[in-house]
């Protein structure tokens, strides 16, 4: 391809509506478990939703430098779009074609990139801009993608725009309700439960909406109705990870931590490398342990045994969380909040543990403190690592107090 055509292609690519022009991730902000989460969700979606996820997965693969795998994901997305056989299919394929064009461009395969640009132009040429178009289908596609990437405010704007033209569209209503649910933690945002109820009426088989409504009802004091919805959703989608996780959140808020752990454990069976889920289990065990510590009967042998087991489980799931990080320092920034991790470390290191486990745990904690630039805490822990084992037990309590 000539240099002139390259320049023309470079002028056209930013006009395409696709993942490469939506600014989905700030630099370095994509979490290391994003790919695992997307892959797990694909299993429980219909063909249209799967295509959306494969488009996103292709973009993630591209960011990871896996161009061949990215193209394979786009092929799956396109096959799914072709099988839809409805009037939206070709319009939604514009996103996939845009992604194809960008990936081929980055691979230096400019003629193939141009071929997909031409496909986009053939669909859009009747509009003012030959390489993009305004329509609810594309707004909805962008909205779902932003929602999956945690860009909830922008996702809500996309769904609002789509619903202006299609106010009763089930897919857009669902996306809008989920975006509003996630944004309600902000004090300036007002959320009506009616949005979730309307979305459920339009999508009666969507169990994720059902558990979100249950959580909202729990906050409103309607615990019994919320739990009824939770049980119904779990009965109809017993292995859907996002449903299990929200159900676990429901029982956590209700105070039933054992049930929350049970549901998180079930979710982990189908997504074994999901470190955030391991961290949630870790936190639930830590909460049960704190509850026991605050109770009486300190000399009860049964209670001491239970507390020892909870410390072991807290440590076990902490290690599992850290082991599933991708970076050399196990991506501490991608864990749950630093204070939460730190509390678990402090709880475990105050007790005796096997030599190898203790050494590894302290080294990980030093890395954690170093990552967060807590130099004084780091120095104290590094000093502790230099002590012979029989001297460490004397110093442990002091180090715990410092951290």
UniProtKB/Swiss-Prot annotation:
The keyword Cytoplasm applies. InterPro entries: TPR-like_helical_dom_sf, TPR_rpt. One of its GO terms (cellular component) is mitochondrion. One of its GO terms (biological process) is response to stilbenoid. Induction: Induced by T.gondii infection in the testes and uterus. TPR repeats lie at residues 94-127, 136-169, 172-206, 241-274. It comes from the Eukaryota. Keywords: Antiviral defense, Cytoplasm, Immunity, Innate immunity, Mitochondrion, Repeat, TPR repeat. Transmembrane segments: none annotated. IFN-induced antiviral protein which acts as an inhibitor of cellular as well as viral processes, cell migration, proliferation, signaling, and viral replication. Enhances MAVS-mediated host antiviral responses by serving as an adapter bridging TBK1 to MAVS which leads to the activation of TBK1 and phosphorylation of IRF3 and phosphorylated IRF3 translocates into nucleus to promote antiviral gene transcription. Exhibits an antiproliferative activity via the up-regulation of cell cycle negative regulators CDKN1A/p21 and CDKN1B/p27. Component of an interferon-dependent multiprotein complex, at least composed of IFIT1, IFIT2 and IFIT3. Interacts with IFIT1 and IFIT2. Interacts (via N-terminus) with MAVS, TBK1, TRAF6 and RIGI. Interacts with COPS5. PANTHER family: INTERFERON-INDUCED PROTEIN WITH TETRATRICOPEPTIDE REPEATS, INTERFERON-INDUCED PROTEIN WITH TETRATRICOPEPTIDE REPEATS 3. Belongs to the IFIT family. This is Interferon-induced protein with tetratricopeptide repeats 3. It comes from Mus musculus. The gene is Ifit3.
């Amino acid at each position: 391809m000539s240099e002139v055509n390259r320049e023309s292609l470079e002028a056209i690519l930013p006009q395409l509506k696709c993942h490469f022009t939506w600014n989905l991730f700030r630099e370095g902000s994509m979490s290391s478990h994003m790919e695992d989460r997307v892959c797990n969700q694909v299993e429980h979606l219909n063909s249209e939703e799967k295509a959306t996820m494969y488009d996103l997965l292709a973009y993630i693969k591209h960011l990871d430098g896996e161009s061949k795998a990215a193209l394979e994901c786009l092929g799956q997305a396109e096959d799914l779009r072709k099988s839809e056989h409805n009037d939206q299919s070709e319009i939604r394929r514009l996103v996939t074609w845009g992604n194809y064009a960008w990936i081929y461009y980055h691979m230096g395969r400019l003629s193939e990139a141009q071929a997909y640009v031409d496909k986009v132009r053939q669909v859009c040429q009747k509009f003012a801009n030959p390489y993009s178009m305004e329509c609810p289908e594309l707004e909805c596609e962008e909205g779902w993608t932003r929602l999956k990437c945690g860009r909830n405010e922008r996702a809500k704007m996309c769904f609002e725009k789509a619903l202006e033209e299609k106010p009763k569209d089930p897919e857009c209503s669902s996306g809008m309700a989920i975006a509003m649910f996630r944004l309600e933690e902000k004090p300036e945002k007002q959320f009506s439960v009616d949005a979730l109820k309307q979305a459920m009426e339009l999508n009666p088989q969507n169990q994720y909406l059902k558990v979100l409504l249950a959580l909202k009802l729990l906050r409103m004091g309607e615990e019994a109705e919320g739990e009824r919805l939770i049980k119904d959703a779990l009965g109809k989608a017993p292995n859907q990870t996002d449903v299990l996780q929200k159900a676990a959140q429901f029982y956590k808020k209700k105070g039933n931590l054992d049930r929350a752990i049970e549901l998180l454990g079930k979710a982990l069976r189908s997504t074994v490398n999901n470190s955030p889920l391991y961290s949630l289990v870790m936190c639930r065990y830590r909460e049960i342990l704190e509850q026991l510590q605050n109770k009486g009967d300190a000399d009860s042998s049964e209670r001491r045994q239970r507390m020892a087991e909870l410390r072991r489980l807290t440590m076990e799931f902490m290690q599992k969380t850290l082991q599933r990080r991708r970076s050399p320092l196990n991506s501490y920034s991608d864990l749950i909040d630093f204070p939460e991790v730190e509390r678990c470390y402090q709880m475990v290191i105050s007790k005796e543990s096997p030599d190898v486990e203790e050494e590894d745990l302290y080294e990980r904690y030093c890395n954690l403190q170093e990552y967060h630039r807590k130099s004084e805490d780091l120095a104290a822990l590094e000093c502790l690592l230099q002590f012979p084992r029989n001297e460490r037990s004397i110093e442990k309590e002091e180090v715990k107090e410092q951290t």
